[in-house]
Amino acid sequence: MSKIEVLVACMNQHNDELYSTMNLQTDAILANQCDEHSYREYIQPDGNTVKLISSADRGVGKNRNKALAYATGEYVINADQDMIFVDGYSQKIEEAFSKIPQADMIIFNLEYLNRFTPGKKQKQKFKRLHLWNSMRYGTARAVIRRGAIEKNCLSYSTLYGGGAKYCSGEDSLFIREAFKKGLKIYITPTVIAKVKQEESSWFTGLNDKYFIDKGVLIANAFPALKNLFVYYFAFGKRNVSKDHSFFKICKLMRQGFKQYKNI
């Protein structure tokens, strides 16, 4: 059994081919969204085990929760199927945790082969992450002590992300919940994978739904500060879309507040 286990949220897989495609070098779980319910295990030539858990359920949050339920590694890496891991990533991870043994979660860096993904930023230095600046980071590339997840009963929201009602945010809420439970979270510039994303499962442009969904997410994550976050977010996006002024963005996000109240 590997000390490190990669949990991949994926779609329409029929075998363990992703193990080689993603350059995996540890145990892995493929939480596979498709049209059947099945479970298979594959032993790799290097001795690692790949678990293929297929389900017809929809939503990336459900996928990630299934992977967590089957995980056995001391450290688990949340990953997407468009990631290609660098050689020796497991050693890089173990070295990082040995340097900061108090860490419950470390968010590593990714090298983007294109810049399709909106809002992703390269991390330039190692530092402690705080709640106020955590919303910009996703959990794909986050490495977490599995014991901390189980001890604190952490799971992903099934309302957000690809395949769910609202377009994104399940990973941001996971990190926020981790902070609320007292986990110590760090970020590091160490690259553990490359991303070759060419299309998004949720991002269809800066349309009305995008801003409404952001309002739903902010009302969930920061109920006491949601109005302040609206102005902050709208100011940052005011010149990005010619069809969405500062005031229109605020209006749409407040529609999201109302939707969240009625969930």
Residue ranges with predicted function:
Residues P118-G147:
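Short, flexible, basic/aromatic active-site loop/helix in glycosyltransferases
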